[in-house]
Amino acid sequence: MTSPDLERLVSLGHLKRESPSEREIAGLLRVGRARLADSRRAELALESRFDLAYNAAHALALAALRRKGFRAANRYLVFQCLAHTTELPTVVWRIFATAHNARNFLEYEGGDDADERLVLDLIGATMALDEQL
């Protein structure tokens, strides 16, 4: 059964229905988990750890959405849909929203450093997401 909120996003064109692909989901889980493991390597630069953790979170969140039979029109929506694709508490998916904004600042506006607290919170939130999958 799908959430009425997800169905509303379909009607608005933000999501589209697409049959789940076990191969795609397995690949997203594999890549997400590998990136999550690498993000925990303290010898890497903080910016690298942030990038790895953010991309791990995105891959795992996309896997959760694909399992429900949907595909998102943009990256941010994958995180917003976690309220309907997982049982994660609000605080966890808000960390992903904060990380998405930080990622855009670093990528598109020339931000020069990653915040260590955010990186650690992002890794923890991504681990919580992985546990649900």
For every predicted segment, state its role.
Residues 1-133:
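Terminal alpha-helical segments
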